[in-house]
Swiss-Prot record:
One of the protein's GO biological processes: ubiquitin-dependent protein catabolic process via the N-end rule pathway
EC assignment: 2.3.2.29
Protein known as: Aspartate/glutamate leucyltransferase
Reaction catalyzed: N-terminal L-glutamyl-[protein] + L-leucyl-tRNA(Leu) = N-terminal L-leucyl-L-glutamyl-[protein] + tRNA(Leu) + H(+); N-terminal L-aspartyl-[protein] + L-leucyl-tRNA(Leu) = N-terminal L-leucyl-L-aspartyl-[protein] + tRNA(Leu) + H(+)
Recorded GO CC terms: cytoplasm
Protein family: Belongs to the R-transferase family. Bpt subfamily.
Gene: bpt
Gene source species: Bordetella avium (strain 197N)
Membrane-crossing residue ranges in chain numbering: none
Length: 240
C-alpha cells in the first residue's frame, strides 16, 4: 500500500486490485483503486472521496484504475440548472402516479425478489443475476455513510422500483436502482429525475451518477442529463 497523497487524509491509503474482466467494454481488463481502511471512511470523508471520482459498493470505496484506459468518467448533474429534454419530460409525466417512500437500509424479501427479477430480466448472464441474499445485502444494504433506500410504489401498493442513494454535503450520489423489468416506460430515467428534484428540495447542487463511458451503450443515457460536469484529469468541467 502507498499513501493516497492527492487526498487530504493522512490516514487513508489505497491499493490497486488485480485485473478482472471489464463489465462495460468487451475484451477489456479493468482494475480498481480502493480506499482503505474502510472503517475510517465516514460520511465527511466519503463526500470528499466522491468529489475525487470515487464510488461506493457496499463497504468498498473505489474508482477505476485501469491500465492504459481512462474510459470511465465520473459524471454529476447540475441540479440547479438542469433542464429535461423531451423524453425525460415524458418519463416524468408517465410515472407521476408513483409514490416514493424514503427509509433507512433494511432487509426485505419483497426488495430482494424485485432485485432478482430485475437482474434476470435486464442483465441475464451478467454475474449478478444469481446473487444470493447475502451478496445482495453486502452490495446494497451495507454502508457506513448516510444512505437511504427509496421505494417507489403504485397507488395500490405494488412495489415497482427501489433506489439506493447516498446523501453528501454537496449533493446526492445515485448508488443503484432496480425495478420491475416487465413494466413499460423509463423507470430508470424517472428515478434520476426524482433524485434531481430531491437535490433541489434539499438545496444540494449536484447529483452524482457514477461513471459515463462513451463507447458503452449501457452508460449512454447519463450524457443526456444536462447541464453536467465530468471529472477529467483531476478537475470537474462541463463537456464541450
Amino acid at each position: 500500500m502507498s499513501q493516497l497523497k492527492e487526498l487530504p487524509f493522512s490516514t487513508l491509503q489505497f491499493y490497486a486490485t488485480a485485473p478482472y474482466p471489464c463489465s462495460y467494454l468487451p475484451e477489456r481488463q479493468a482494475r480498481s483503486q480502493v480506499a482503505a481502511p474502510g472503517h475510517l471512511i465516514n460520511a465527511d470523508t466519503y463526500c470528499q472521496l466522491v468529489q475525487q471520482g470515487f464510488r461506493r459498493s457496499g463497504l468498498f470505496t473505489y474508482r477505476p484504475h485501469c491500465d492504459n484506459c481512462q474510459a470511465c468518467i465520473p459524471v454529476r448533474v447540475d441540479s440547479v440548472n438542469y433542464t429535461p429534454n423531451r423524453s425525460q419530460r415524458r418519463a416524468w409525466k408517465a410515472h407521476q402516479g408513483l409514490r416514493a417512500f424514503v427509509a433507512e437500509l433494511a432487509w426485505s424479501p419483497e426488495h430482494y425478489s424485485l432485485y432478482t427479477r430485475y437482474q434476470q430480466g435486464r442483465h441475464p448472464g451478467g454475474g449478478m443475476d444469481d446473487d444470493s441474499r447475502s451478496q445482495y445485502a453486502q452490495f446494497l444494504l451495507t454502508s457506513r455513510v448516510n444512505t437511504r433506500l427509496v421505494e417507489f410504489r403504485q397507488p395500490e401498493g405494488q412495489l415497482v422500483m427501489v433506489s439506493i442513494i447516498d446523501v453528501l454535503d454537496d449533493g446526492l450520489s445515485s448508488v443503484y436502482t432496480f425495478y420491475d423489468p416487465e413494466l413499460a416506460g423509463s423507470l430508470g430515467t424517472y428515478s434520476i429525475l426524482w433524485q434531481i428534484e430531491q437535490c433541489r428540495m434539499l438545496e444540494l447542487p449536484w447529483l452524482y451518477l457514477g461513471y459515463w463511458i462513451k463507447d458503452s451503450r449501457k452508460m449512454a443515457y447519463k450524457a443526456g442529463f444536462l447541464p453536467q460536469e465530468r471529472y477529467i484529469d483531476g478537475q470537474w468541467t462541463a463537456p464541450e
